[in-house]
Amino acid sequence: MNSMKQSLAICLSILLIWAMMPPGADAGAWPATTPTHAPQELYAPVPPNDMDALVAPIALYPDALVAQILGASTYPDQVEAADAFVKANLGMTGDRLQQAAQDEEWDPSVMALLQFPSVLEKLAQNLGWTSALGDVSANQQADVMAAIQRMRAKAYDAGNLKSGQQIKVVKESPDIIVIQPANPQVVYVPAYNPTVIYGSPVATPGYSTTAVATTAV
């Protein structure tokens, strides 16, 4: 099971790339993927409306960061441990922090989030939501990507998702909105309240919006 989960972040990254392919792109040029996580025997698929609410807190993050979050969400215990590690080593950042964590047996997606302490804290403080996000990421990958695009479209139509100094927003087709850092060397983590930024109220079960700023991304 661990070996299958270790490749989930890579698979999710490929799915994000696939979702961003423009209409008519040659599918043969992209690597074929197969499920990397066995569906839970008693798993009940999450319907679209509930899926939309589940991804709302991260749907407006840059694509590469979304992929890492989805992968890390399948390891909630590791996320909690990584958050505690960061808080215990507040004087460390960047490569130094990564070096200090080398002995930890964490998934690469969790290790990557060491560079984003605010994201780790959000995931650790909302473990119920994080676990639910991990379940759908492992069992309904394509549905998760579709939900992210639906929520981006809502924010875009509401005028709350646009290019700026931190991010570049490109609507490649009616169904595909790509979010990338304006500066490829700096990944900006937007702060927004998912209950209001999408134009209509969105309540995410198990997720607290306390101390989350409401901003146009």
Residues covered by each model-derived region:
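N-terminal low-complexity segments enriched in Gly/Pro/Tyr/Ser
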Residues: 21-217
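Bacterial N-terminal signal peptides that target proteins for export
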Residues: 2-11
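Bacterial N-terminal signal peptides
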Residues: 10-19
